[in-house]
């Protein structure tokens, strides 16, 4: 069992303890340690208040001081240190109206979402498990701490997180937890779409995504999400892990729609990837020659092309025609990419200025068209990417 990340953080806990306070590892890192999984992020919980943490350590960042969280910078690493706290009544099913700092570990752990995430551990690797989290982990069960209805009423995102954990861990959901989700799923309409998208992104990449996605449908979760609410998501099938962006593109192609993505509040990069995925899926079935393959690899991000090809079963499950494997496969994609004479228009040895001077013509719509013709000629091997050769080819093949 790799304890290196815990050992790297140990001096922080020891320094807090040396000042008379309690300190424990908590949350996902402890859960993953119990499961024998790789540890990623270390979270620390303590009886010390934020002010007391700031007085103990010389380099701190008050990232969420009002909620009890201080970042302690130690050996060039950031560690979240959060004070034991009890939360007051929640507002809009998503955030507490306030927090009260407490000195009792049990009181802090009982406010957490699921039993598997409510285990604390000290520097001697002793576990503090008041809610049978280890037993649920051993039985591969996701169960809320306390009454499920209350946990989901406090923060409706916990329902989506539950399905995300199910997808990632291949756990079952406790019956009472699932039934509470069935009756309260409509409350996710109060959440910001940004928080939902973060969870969906992780859910879609989970090894058990098929079951979790089917639960999203059966629990009618999509009915309460912007963008998805206008679609019949029961017609969409996901059989293996894919990017959320690819899912959205599959939805667009399946229903032949061009709905605005603005309600999802995605990044520009995500929107760009979705649009490329759509174009890739629409282009794939028609690629039957090597020249078409060259232009396809040139025009689109090969990582996205590969993602679509690897997801062939998902496309098939949604009645979307895939690629011709003899022409388009992972090997031919890599070989074609390696042999391309150039990878974007910036590599081309002529530009608009050179063309206008050579043809003694003013700028106009013709210019974009001619540059594209040259691009195609170079990529498909009809002319070498040298200025003199390109201009000869233009003289022989282009009319404006």
Curated annotation (Swiss-Prot):
Q: Where does CTP bind?
A: 28, 31, 112, 155, 158, 161, 164
- Which UniProt keywords are listed? ATP-binding, Magnesium, Metal-binding, Nucleotide-binding, Nucleotidyltransferase, RNA repair, RNA-binding, Transferase, tRNA processing
Residues that hold ATP according to the record: 28, 31, 112, 155, 158, 161, 164
Which co-factor is required? Mg(2+)
Q: Which GO terms describe its molecular function?
A: ATP binding; CCA tRNA nucleotidyltransferase activity; magnesium ion binding; tRNA binding
Supply the InterPro entries for this chain: Bact_CCA-adding_enz_type3_sf (IPR050264), CCA-adding_enz_C (IPR032810), CCA-adding_enz_firmicutes (IPR023068), NT_sf (IPR043519), PolA_pol_head_dom (IPR002646), PolyA_RNA-bd (IPR032828)
Q: For Mg(2+), which residues are the binding ones? A: 41, 43
The EC number on file is: 2.7.7.72
The catalysed reaction is: a tRNA precursor + 2 CTP + ATP = a tRNA with a 3' CCA end + 3 diphosphate; a tRNA with a 3' CCA end + 2 CTP + ATP = a tRNA with a 3' CCACCA end + 3 diphosphate
Q: Does the keyword Heme apply?
A: no
Which spans are transmembrane here?
none
Which EC class is the enzyme in?
A: transferase
Gene Ontology biological process terms from the UniProt entry: RNA repair; tRNA 3'-terminal CCA addition
Which family does the entry's similarity section mention? Belongs to the tRNA nucleotidyltransferase/poly(A) polymerase family. Bacterial CCA-adding enzyme type 3 subfamily.
Q: Which NCBIfam families match?
A: PRK13299.1
Q: How does it assemble?
A: Homodimer.
The record ties this protein, via HAMAP family, to: CCA_bact_type3 (MF_01263)
**General remark:** A single active site specifically recognizes both ATP and CTP and is responsible for their addition.
What's its job? Answer: Catalyzes the addition and repair of the essential 3'-terminal CCA sequence in tRNAs without using a nucleic acid template. Adds these three nucleotides in the order of C, C, and A to the tRNA nucleotide-73, using CTP and ATP as substrates and producing inorganic pyrophosphate. tRNA 3'-terminal CCA addition is required both for tRNA processing and repair. Also involved in tRNA surveillance by mediating tandem CCA addition to generate a CCACCA at the 3' terminus of unstable tRNAs. While stable tRNAs receive only 3'-terminal CCA, unstable tRNAs are marked with CCACCA and rapidly degraded.
**Protein's recorded name:** CCA-adding enzyme
Q: What is the originating organism of this protein?
A: Staphylococcus aureus (strain Mu3 / ATCC 700698)
Gene for this chain: cca
């Amino acid at each position: 069992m790799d304890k290196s990340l815990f050992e790297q953080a140990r001096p922080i806990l020891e320094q807090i303890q040396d000042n008379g306070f309690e300190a424990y590892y908590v949350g996902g890192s402890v859960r993953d340690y119990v499961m024998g999984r790789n540890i990623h992020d270390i979270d620390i919980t303590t009886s010390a208040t934020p002010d007391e943490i700031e007085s103990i350590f010389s380099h701190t960042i008050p990232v969420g001081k009002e909620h009890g969280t201080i970042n302690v910078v130690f050996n060039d690493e950031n560690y979240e240190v959060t004070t034991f706290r009890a939360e007051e009544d929640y507002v809009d099913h998503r955030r507490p109206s306030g927090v009260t700092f407490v000195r009792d570990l049990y009181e802090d752990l009982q406010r957490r979402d699921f039993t598997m995430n409510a285990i604390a551990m000290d520097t001697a690797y002793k576990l503090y498990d008041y809610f049978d989290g280890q037993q649920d982990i051993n039985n591969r069960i996701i169960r809320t701490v306390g009454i499920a209805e209350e946990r989901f009423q406090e923060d409706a995102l916990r329902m989506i997180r539950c399905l995300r954990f199910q997808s990632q861990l291949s756990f079952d959901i406790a019956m009472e937890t699932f039934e509470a989700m069935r009756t309260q799923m409509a409350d996710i309409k109060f959440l910001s779409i940004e928080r939902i998208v973060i969870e969906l992104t992780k859910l879609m990449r989970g090894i058990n995504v098929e079951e979790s996605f089917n639960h999203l449908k059966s629990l009618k979760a999509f009915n309460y999400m912007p963008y998805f609410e206008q679609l019949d998501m029961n017609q969409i099938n996901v059989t293996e892990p894919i990017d959320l962006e690819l899912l959205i593109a599959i939805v667009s192609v399946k229903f032949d729609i061009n709905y605005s993505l603005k309600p999802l509040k995605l990044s520009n990069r995500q929107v760009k990837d979705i649009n490329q995925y759509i174009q890739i899926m629409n282009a794939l079935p028609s690629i039957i020659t090597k020249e078409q393959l060259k232009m396809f690899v040139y025009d689109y991000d090969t990582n996205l092309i590969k993602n679509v090809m690897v997801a062939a079963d998902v496309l098939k499950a949604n009645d979307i025609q895939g690629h011709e494997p003899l022409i388009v496969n992972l090997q031919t994609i890599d070989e074609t990419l390696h042999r391309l004479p150039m990878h974007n228009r910036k590599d081309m040895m002529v530009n608009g200025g050179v063309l206008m001077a050579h043809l003694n013509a003013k700028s106009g719509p013709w210019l974009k068209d001619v540059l594209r013709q040259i691009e195609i000629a170079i990529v498909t091997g009809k002319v070498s990417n040298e200025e003199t050769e390109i201009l000869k080819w233009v003289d022989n093949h282009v009319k404006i």
